A protein has these predicted regions:
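Active-site histidine-anchored catalytic micro-motif
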Residues: 17, 21-158
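N-terminal amphipathic/basic-hydrophobic helices that include classical n-h-c signal peptides
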Residues: 1-22
Length: 158
């Protein structure tokens, strides 16, 4: 049978070097202007546009929010009541005014909502298109608006 190296002559190092050579990484960003304190904005088209411009057909895209009172999530885009229900539930879990909050800026609830929702999402790319379910979209989640915010996008692949 021979040992492993005879049967598989490509070393881990050479595989890693080939991977690095064919992997392309594109960094981009865009602004989002929010209109209310709590809001979900569909940013799927902006992300798809960045993927289109990157020329990457297969890989993934990281969508990142560099703010402590806003986040990124993937959820249903067909029924706006879903967004309403998400924001309502988060506001019930973390009310704006709660006895015991110690953060003195008045936005402790916003920090808590951000921690629960998260600040990033990873979406696969296949054939140059975001791999999302029929009803899914990527949403920017504002928890301390209205504000102008930044979204960072990194597209990786080939």
């Amino acid at each position: 049978m021979g040992d492993f190296n005879e049967r598989y002559p490509i070393s881990y190092r050479s595989i890693r070097e080939v991977f690095v050579i064919i992997m392309k990484i594109i960094n981009d960003n865009f602004s989002v202007s929010t209109r209310s304190r709590n809001q979900m904005i569909d940013i799927t088209s902006q992300i798809q546009s960045i993927v289109n411009d990157s020329g990457i057909s297969d890989g993934d895209v990281v969508v990142y929010c560099p703010h402590t009172t806003a986040g990124i999530t993937i959820n249903e885009n067909a029924d706006p009541d879903v967004q309403h229900d998400i924001l309502l539930t988060l506001s019930e879990i973390f009310p704006q005014r709660r006895a015991g909050y110690r953060h003195c800026e008045g936005n402790s609830d916003s920090h808590c909502k951000c921690s629960l929702v998260g600040c990033s999402e990873l979406v696969l790319i296949k054939g140059g298109r975001l791999v999302l379910g029929t009803w899914q979209s990527v949403f920017f989640c504002e928890f301390d608006g209205p504000r102008s915010r930044n979204v960072i996008v990194q597209v990786r692949g080939q």
